[in-house]
Amino acid sequence: MLTADIPPNQSIYIQNLNERIKKEELKRSLYCLFSQFGRILDVVALKTPKLRGQAWVTFSEVTAAGHAVRQMQNFPFYDKPMRLQYAKAKSDCLAKAEGTFVPKDKKRKQEEKVERKREDSQRPNTANGPSANGPSANNGVPAPSFQPSGQETMPPNNILFIQNLPHETTSMMLQLLFEQYPGFKEIRMIDAKPGIAFVEYEDDVQASIAMQPLQGFKITPQNPMVISFAKK
């Protein structure tokens, strides 16, 4: 239900999110879920005590935000129904673009500083590990590129083969995308082979319907999905 005293704008405020989900996974999942409504400019989620279970998503268009609020109200996201409304304050990215940005107050800055320190303390130390830009950045395996494989010409199948996924993709992130289409059954991922997944539907017609709009969908800007029918 839209909040009457908050005028429609490009940012939406989301509550009742699962607090056990890690921040980066939460942001990626929200991006995947809400990209269907329009271009997303920013996703903000902090894990400080006061801001847990909340997030903000900013679209490039007000109409996209409106569609998202109406259609995703009470949507079960990580086993909890989301509560959505328009955000009260303009997002930083919009304010900067319009030249009206005012820095956050000291208290908010301090909260973000504490959050960054907490994340840094939990991040594994890679100082002596392989260079992030070196050939071993992905355990010696080159990052997948957007190259269609021969499997794109496979005959229709009720199982889709997904390639070029970011290695941090989770089954829940994919489920949020593919369960929007009728006949969805399950996601299958292989731990030993990151970057690929299988999505099963009840029949090959339903699989084809899902394939068309999601072909090339970008979970991250660098990773357009490559979808083909799986081998029978």
Curated annotation (Swiss-Prot):
One of its GO terms (biological process) is cis assembly of pre-catalytic spliceosome. Residues 100-157 are annotated as: Disordered. Disulfide bonds: none annotated. Residues 10-89, 158-232 form the RRM domain. Its main location: nucleus. It is found in: Nucleus, Cajal body; Nucleus, Nucleoplasm; Cytoplasm. Gene3D superfamilies: 3.30.70.330. GO terms for cellular component: Cajal body; cytoplasm; nucleoplasm; spliceosomal complex; U2 snRNP. Residues 123-139, 146-156 have a biased composition (Polar residues). Coiled coil: none annotated. It holds the Pfam family RRM_1. Keywords: Cytoplasm, mRNA processing, mRNA splicing, Nucleus, Repeat, Ribonucleoprotein, RNA-binding, Spliceosome. InterPro entries: Nucleotide-bd_a/b_plait_sf (IPR012677), RBD_domain_sf (IPR035979), RRM_dom (IPR000504). Residues 108-122 have a biased composition (Basic and acidic residues). One of its GO terms (molecular function) is RNA binding. Component of the spliceosome where it is associated with snRNP U2. Belongs to the RRM U1 A/B'' family. Involved in nuclear pre-mRNA splicing. This is U2 small nuclear ribonucleoprotein B''. It comes from Arabidopsis thaliana. The gene is U2B''.
